[in-house]
């Protein structure tokens, strides 16, 4: 495997390759200008977090860092501490030395966090690799059997706000801690430790410029008409969100 990180953007994943599945990257960053459509004129990173608080600037980990690295337990560990207005966030990338997989870990040390939305674990698929006609996502939503949802090239936006008080319209339970997304030949498996952080999953998909945009976003905090009465939360004073990415496919 090969993993390229962006030290100017808080160790965001520029690209991740699993050579057993493809010579092209499976996930990574789609830079500004990748799409001609002005509605998609942004950098679409993988592996970062975004905290949005009404009436305030966004807080992210997309800052320049000088990472430390070491070999521990047969894995490469790349780490950095990112200062924010709410407190430090420690970020670690763990790369397996034997099998093609890696982990992204965010450890939040925020004594108090205002009400808002905290989205992280962004995983952006490479639209030049996965076949558009057979794209799908799959997860458990409370049952014993995983549910598979073919996209059929229809737009999906689970993060579309319902109103000014309700920040997201749909979400995935991810009750087994696993989400898979890809096509009929190959897919990416994202595993999250739900016992440490009960995140929800959200899918974004749209056909764009004869290609498409397909991304999974995990959420650790959303807003609704009840949470708007909460001034701040202490749950992020010692919270770790950990996810592992593995490539899968049919031989």
Question: Residues of each region from the PLM?
Answer:
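An exposed, glycine/acidic-rich loop-and-rim segment of catalytic or binding clefts
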Residues: 94-166
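Amphipathic, interaction-prone secondary-structure segments
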Residues: 4-5
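Extended, charge-rich low-complexity regions and/or helical-solenoid scaffolds
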Residues: 32-51, 57-68, 92, 121-138, ...
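Beta-strand-rich recognition/accessory modules
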Residues: 1, 10, 17-33, 52, ...
């Amino acid at each position: 495997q090969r993993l390229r990180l962006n030290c100017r953007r808080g160790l965001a994943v520029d690209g991740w390759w699993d050579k057993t599945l493809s010579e092209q990257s499976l996930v990574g960053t789609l830079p500004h200008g990748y799409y001609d459509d002005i509605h998609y004129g942004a950098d679409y990173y993988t592996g970062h977090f975004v905290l949005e608080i009404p009436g305030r600037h966004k807080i992210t980990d997309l800052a320049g860092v000088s990472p430390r690295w070491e070999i521990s337990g047969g894995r490469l560990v790349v780490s950095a501490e990112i200062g924010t207005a709410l407190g430090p966030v420690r970020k670690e990338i763990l790369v397996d030395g034997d099998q093609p997989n890696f982990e992204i870990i965010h450890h939040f040390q925020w004594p108090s966090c205002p009400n808002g939305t905290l989205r992280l674990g962004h995983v952006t698929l490479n639209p030049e690799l996965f076949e558009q006609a057979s794209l799908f996502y799959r997860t458990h939503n409370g049952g014993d059997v995983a549910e598979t949802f073919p996209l059929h090239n229809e737009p999906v936006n689970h993060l579309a706000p319902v109103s000014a008080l309700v920040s997201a319209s749909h979400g995935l339970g991810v009750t087994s801690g696993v989400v898979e997304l890809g096509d009929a030949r190959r897919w990416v498996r994202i595993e999250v430790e739900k016992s440490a952080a009960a995140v929800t999953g959200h899918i974004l998909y749209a056909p764009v410029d004869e290609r498409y945009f397909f991304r999974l976003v995990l959420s650790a905090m959303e807003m609704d008409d009840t949470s708007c009465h909460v001034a701040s939360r202490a749950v992020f004073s010692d919270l770790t969100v950990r996810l592992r990415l593995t490539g899968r496919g049919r031989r």
